[in-house]
Amino acid sequence: MPYTVRANDQGNVRVVCPATEREYAPEELVASILRKLVDDASTYLGEPVEAAVITVPAYFNDAQRQATRDAGRLAGISVERILNEPTAAALAYGFDRSTVKRVLVFDLGGGTFDVSVLRIAQGVFDVKATSGDTQLGGNDWDRRIVDWLADAFQAEHSIDLRRDRQALQRLTEAAEKAKIELSGVQSTPISLPFIATGADGPLHIETTLERSVFESLCPDLLDRLLRPVQRALRDSGLAAEDIDDVVLVGGSTRMPMVQQMVRTLIPLEPCQSVNPDEVVAIGAAVQAGILTGELRDLMLNDVTPLSLGLETIGGVMKVLIPRNTPIPVRKSDVFSTSEPNQSSVEVHVLQGERQMAEGNKSLGRFRLSGIPPAPRGVPQVQVSFDIDANGLLQVSATDRTTGRQQSVSIQGGSNLSEEEIKQLIEEAEQKATEDRRRKAEIDRRNRALTLVAQAERRLRDAADRKSTRLNSSHVS
């Protein structure tokens, strides 16, 4: 990555940008992209876009979903729904509503991988199971080519190109280009002139990558794709032969090795009638139509991708909401104190599939105080988990004796506090006003320059015509 990524004083991620001489939270960077999309859409539609459906990888945890919602707020839009990408893809395809279909959606993007199993009948889309890997995507295939090129170059010239940022960027671009080309041909040339300088002058890369060689570099990546598919099928209670349709989503599914792996696992020809790069956006538009009431004959029932629970005595995770539970959902359980006369309890909210708390994602902590003195195990504290249709979690704890309650919307994984979000929104609004003013000035200046240029051109044309008439009169 050409930018420095570090942790600030609170341990949150910050990206250092030398050009602007400031640090950015990931939410700010995503907000910039969303703002550009909103501006382009508003220009195209001729009216302001104020709300949106945003898709995310199905295996995003609560913290990542909350960060996505925060990015939408920073961009100045109301996030009406956060939709899982495989579910969006299924909505885009629609499928025949006269029959019951069991569909597997295989979504391999640039940086994440998701797989979902749905039951579709009479316009009702029921997500039965979802699985995935948020650290696996097409970029991993790119890196295999980068390493192949860099290792060969280092063996020949004793120079590691991965230590040079500019050289690494060129390698990465060439690797992605080669990966894309190998989806349609058996071999592709790779040319990188002046990639480095040796003792005798400039050095170059001139080589050819065969598809078979590329595939030999990636067997472990295919294995990592296989496991989530098997898990999703197992969680849905279906076998591979029970699947009626397979939908491929994401540009990385164009790789022949990926398509062949899917065919081997599920002996069906995948549906490819919609562009895999566009199908998720189309599904998001369908979901927006459902929310606005323009599409009344469709219903979507999604699930939570990971188990949710809290830490109990001994560091064990107690699951309240198992993975693949349909959402929205509310689940409660009763807990007690671990010490005599304990006046407060800390609720540590977790997400993940490990039995021990330390192996799972910590979403946040809060404390319920004011518990009356009592022997260990006597007080009763009811803890409730609420997940909304966006997959976002709210947790509450209530002392049954006093009725005292403490609740919190989990934001433990967000990189921005509520105060920071409000400040950034105000800054964005101020900058938006300034940007509009500057754009208006530039537009006026450009129009003036255009008018001046047109006037000068007309004057020249008039002078040329007058000169031509004078010359004609002189000749005659």
Give the ranges of each region predicted by the language model:
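Oxyanion-binding/catalytic loops of NTP- or PPi-dependent enzymes
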Residues: 1-11, 16-27, 32, 39-469, ...
